[in-house]
Amino acid sequence: MAKVYYYGTGRRKKSVARVRLVPGEGKFSINDRSLDDYFGLETLKVIVKQPLTLTDTLTKFDVICKVIGGGFTGQAGAIRHGISRALLKADEELRPALKKAGFLTRDPRMKERKKYGLKKARRAPQFSKR
C-alpha cells in the first residue's frame, strides 16, 4: 500500500526544494542527511522549521526533502517555501496563518547581473583624479 504524503515545491534564488511531508513525529531528512548535519547555522535551522512551528505541526509530520542549487541560505528559504506549500495540501485551513507570515510568497529577489565596464553588478572600478 502506498504511503500517504503531501508534496510541495519551494524556490528561493537559485535553489529548488522538493519537499514531502509524511505523517510522523517530526524528523527532518534533507538530501539523506539530518537537519543538524546539513545546516550548521542555528538561524538556518530555525528558517526551515518556521512553517511547522507557526502551525503547531512540528511533531505531526516527518519532512523528507531533496534540494539542489544555490547556497545554504537560498536552500533554507526554498525548503521553507516547499514545506508551506505541502502544509496547504495537508490542511487548507492553515492558509491564512501561512499567508500572513509570508511563507507562501515566492521571494522574487535574484542576483543582479554583472554589467560590462563595471567590476560587479554595480561596483565601478576605482576612480583616480590624477
Swiss-Prot record:
For this chain, the family text in UniProt reads:
Belongs to the universal ribosomal protein uS9 family.
Which protein, by its recorded name, is this?
Small ribosomal subunit protein uS9
Q: What broad taxonomic lineage does this protein's source fall under?
A: Bacteria, Bacillati, Bacillota, Clostridia, Eubacteriales
GO BP term, example:
translation
Entry annotated with the keyword Ribonucleoprotein = yes
Q: Name one Pfam family in it.
A: Ribosomal_S9
Q: Note the NCBIfam families from the entry.
A: PRK00132.1
| Basic residues compositional bias, start-end | 111-130
Q: Which UniProt keywords apply?
A: Ribonucleoprotein, Ribosomal protein
Q: Where is this region: Disordered?
A: 104-130
GO terms, molecular function? RNA binding; structural constituent of ribosome
List, alphabetically, the GO terms of the cellular component aspect.
Answer: cytosolic small ribosomal subunit
The reply on keyword DNA-binding is no
